[in-house]
Swiss-Prot record:
Compositional bias segments (type: Low complexity): 105-114
CDD domains according to UniProt: HMG-CoA_reductase_classI (cd00643)
Domain of life: Eukaryota
Keyword Endoplasmic reticulum: yes
InterPro entries reported in the protein's UniProt record: HMG_CoA_Rdtase (IPR002202), HMG_CoA_Rdtase_cat_sf (IPR023074), HMG_CoA_Rdtase_CS (IPR023076), HMG_CoA_Rdtase_eu_arc (IPR004554), HMG_CoA_Rdtase_N (IPR023282), HMG_CoA_Rdtase_NAD(P)-bd_sf (IPR009023), HMG_CoA_Rdtase_sub-bd_dom_sf (IPR009029)
NCBIfam families found in the cross-reference section: HMG_CoA_R_NADP
Chain's gene name: HMG1
Source species taxonomy: Eukaryota, Viridiplantae, Streptophyta, Embryophyta, Tracheophyta
Family: Belongs to the HMG-CoA reductase family.
Keywords of the record: Endoplasmic reticulum, Glycoprotein, Isoprene biosynthesis, Membrane, NADP, Oxidoreductase, Transmembrane, Transmembrane helix
A Pfam cross-reference name: HMG-CoA_red
Database matches in PANTHER family: 3-HYDROXY-3-METHYLGLUTARYL-COENZYME A REDUCTASE, 3-HYDROXY-3-METHYLGLUTARYL-COENZYME A REDUCTASE 1
Name of the featured protein: 3-hydroxy-3-methylglutaryl-coenzyme A reductase 1
Length: 539
């Protein structure tokens, strides 16, 4: 670092040099300070004794005592008053290697960057990038040291280029609010990824029209859902039912024996104890309200599945805090209970599981529509009979042959993922949110088609997570579900879940029609980029 500059880097080095003068003492600082204190105390006591003996004349000893006391006072005053005096630390070091009690110059440490005027804030970009690239400055501390999230991301990006030797020019940087994502969406950002957003619709659902935003790179997907929306709207619309609303978290605990674990299971599931446990759970949030507790036993390990409503939030953090409250209470009642993990996979999050398929997680929704026979022929280019037969052979029997778990559908995850990314949901939760069974039946003497999708685990929220980002907030606003519903907490998240199910209904209808009519490959060759890529490669 060039100390000739007038920036913070020069001041840090200068302070370190001044601090070295304190380290030049012949004895360690701790011993020197102790000797000074002892000298001050002894000389003071000696002077008090001499003052009480007024008849004794002053001699060499008395003068030596006075000089010793004055020297001790001057030393200690200079030690405590000097701004560059070293501080002795006893806490853990930043790198986790605690226990060190060595005296070190406080001024030689980088100044905190939470406010203006810190040394790192005034250092130039080149110094900071070099420090990050060399490992002297951890990349994850740039935001806190600089106090400027945008600058931190820009310098991290440059340091990444130097370390890897590869540029990221194609990765956009401008246009992102890096302050908004701090502590909420992403750590150590260097830019953001662009995804095209298409709009399908209008989807006529429960008497209201929705234009559905979908972020995807799969050609033909938005067009297919749009055709399904057109068929549904032309037939009078779709209707949805919310069956259940409860996010779950299942901690894993261990007890000394299976018998003792069974006792805890009985206690947690006893109706007489529910109000007590609910009161403990509900302390964590204004909106989180415990709905039920269901337990599973494996040897002496117990898995307690807590389910609660979470307002307009998806609710994972909310339910986790409530679970911690209950675990603290249960440890008083069962002191031999050992908490292994706040999540024991019986929840079950981001995994296709039978418990979610049967019990549900998040919002459980059924959406249905009756498609007129003439619409099936004119819009979908097929027949009711072919669609019903295809659904049985493909979605039901075919999925059973494959051993599917909640995958009795054509492509529900396509629509769920595209909607999740567009509206700021957790894309990884499309695993359980896409669990869906699609049913098709002939009605009205075979003239019309009844289609439904049953989705037991749609995990969505309209506040928190990625919903704070400008693009995702705009998509939520397009659907009329942005933010929390103050008049009816939870209403926006519930409506978003029904929109997801309605969009899946449209996507299922259109894809099955394309398969039944033999148009799938042709439509993908028309709308998918693969044909263009092949043409480029051939030329």
């Amino acid at each position: 670092m060039d100390v000739r500059r007038g920036g913070g880097g020069g001041r840090i080095v200068g302070a370190a040099r001044r601090a070295l003068t304190w380290g030049a003492l012949p004895l360690p600082m701790r011993i020197t300070n102790g000797l000074a204190m002892v000298s001050l105390v002894l000389s003071s006591c000696d002077l008090l004794r001499l003052c009480s003996d007024r008849e004794r004349p002053l001699g060499g000893r008395e003068f030596a005592t006075v000089v010793c006391q004055l020297a001790s006072v001057v030393y200690l005053l200079s030690l405590f008053a000097h701004p560059d005096a070293p501080a002795t630390t006893t806490g853990d070091d930043d790198d986790g290697q605690g226990g060190s009690r060595r005296a070190r110059p406080a001024a030689a440490e980088p100044a905190p960057m939470h406010g203006h005027g810190g040394g790192m804030m005034e250092a130039d970009d080149e110094e900071i990038v070099a420090a990050v690239a060399s490992g002297a400055l951890p990349s994850h501390r740039l935001e806190s040291r600089l106090g400027d999230c945008r600058r931190a991301a820009r310098l991290r990006r440059e340091a990444l280029r130097r370390v890897t030797g590869r540029g990221v020019e194609g990765l956009p940087f401008d246009g992102m609010d890096y302050q908004a994502i701090l502590g909420q969406c992403c750590e150590m950002p260097v830019g953001y990824v662009q995804l095209p957003v298409g709009v399908a619709g209008p989807l006529l659902l429960d008497g209201r029209e929705y234009h559905v935003p979908m972020a995807t790179t799969e050609g033909c997907l938005v067009a297919s859902v749009n055709r399904g929306c057109r068929a549904i709207s032309a037939s009078g619309g779709a209707f949805s039912v919310l069956l259940r609303d409860a996010m779950s978290r299942a901690p894993a605990v261990k007890l000394p024996s299976a018998m003792r674990a069974a006792e805890l299971k009985a206690f947690a599931e006893a109706p007489a104890n529910f109000e007590l446990l609910a009161a403990v759970f509900n302390r964590s949030s204004r909106f989180g309200r415990l709905q039920d507790i269901r337990c599973a036993l494996a040897g002496r390990n117990l898995y307690m599945r807590f389910s609660c409503i979470t307002g307009d939030a998806m609710g994972m953090n909310m339910v986790s805090k409530g679970v911690e409250n209950v675990l603290g209470y249960l440890q008083n009642v069962f002191p031999d209970m050992d908490v292994i993990s706040v999540s024991g996979n019986y929840c079950s999050d981001k995994k296709p599981t039978a418990v979610n398929w049967i019990e549900g997680r998040g919002k459980s929704v059924v959406c249905e529509a009756i498609i007129k026979g003439d619409v099936v022929q004119k819009v979908l280019k097929t027949t009711v009979e072919k669609l019903v037969e295809l659904n049985i052979i493909k979605n039901l029997a075919g999925s059973a042959v494959a051993g599917a778990l909640g995958g009795f559908n054509a492509h529900a995850s396509n629509i769920v993922t595209a909607l999740f990314i567009a509206t700021g949901q957790d894309p990884a939760q499309n695993v359980e949110s896409s669990q869906c069974i699609t049913m098709l039946e002939e009605v009205d003497d075979g003239d019309d088609l009844h289609i439904s999708v049953t989705m037991p685990s749609i995990e969505v929220g309209t506040i928190g997570g990625g919903t704070c980002l400008a693009s995702q907030a705009a998509c939520l606003n397009l659907l009329g579900v942005k933010g929390s519903n103050h008049g009816s907490p939870g209403a926006n998240a519930k409506r978003l879940a029904t929109i997801v199910a309605g969009s899946v209904l449209a996507g299922e209808l259109s894809l099955l029609a394309a398969l039944a009519s033999g148009h799938l490959v042709k439509s993908h060759m028309m709308y998918n980029r693969s044909s263009k890529d092949v043409a480029k490669a051939a030329s």
